[in-house]
Curated annotation (Swiss-Prot):
Ranges that cross the membrane: none
Protein name from the UniProt record: Large ribosomal subunit protein bL33
Family affiliation: Belongs to the bacterial ribosomal protein bL33 family.
Designated gene of the protein: rpmG
Pfam families: Ribosomal_L33 (PF00471)
Highest taxon listed in the record's lineage: Bacteria
Lineage start: Bacteria, Pseudomonadati, Pseudomonadota, Gammaproteobacteria, Candidatus Pseudothioglobaceae
NCBIfam families linked: PRK00595.1, rpmG_bact
Protein keywords: Ribonucleoprotein, Ribosomal protein
């Protein structure tokens, strides 16, 4: 079953993306390098729980 996750910028800008992942096949936390429009650079985004 796919679940929605929140990817938060490591640049501490408050910007985030939402994505889905299959937690049964990939139980580890996701870390992806994506563009942060606030700082206008590519930074690491880390998975956090959606409240």
């Amino acid at each position: 079953m796919r679940e929605t996750i929140k990817l938060v910028s490591s640049a501490k800008t408050g910007h985030f993306y939402t994505a889905t992942k299959n937690k049964r096949l990939h139980p580890e936390k996701v870390e992806v390098k994506k563009f942060d429009p606030v700082v206008r650079k590519h930074v690491m985004y880390k998975e956090v729980k959606i409240k």
